[in-house]
Amino acid sequence: AIGPVDEV
């Protein structure tokens, strides 16, 4: 992922 959030 990219940025402060991550996809599970």
UniProtKB/Swiss-Prot annotation:
Any idea where this protein resides?
Secreted
Say which domain of life the source belongs to.
Eukaryota
GO BP annotations of the record are:
lignin catabolic process
UniProt EC number: 1.10.3.2
Keyword match Nucleotide-binding: no
- Misc remark: Inhibits cell proliferation of HepG2 hepatoma cell line with an IC(50) of 2.6 uM and L1210 mouse leukemia cell line with an IC(50)=3.2 uM respectively.
Q: What does this protein do?
A: Lignin degradation and detoxification of lignin-derived products. Exhibits broad substrate specificity against a range of aromatic compounds with highest activity against guaiacol. Shows lower activity against 4-methylcatechol, 4-hydroxyindole, catechol, hydroquinone and 2,6-dimethoxy-phenol.
Q: Which family does it belong to?
A: Belongs to the multicopper oxidase family.
Q: What is this protein called?
A: Laccase
**Taxonomic source organism:** Sanghuangporus baumii
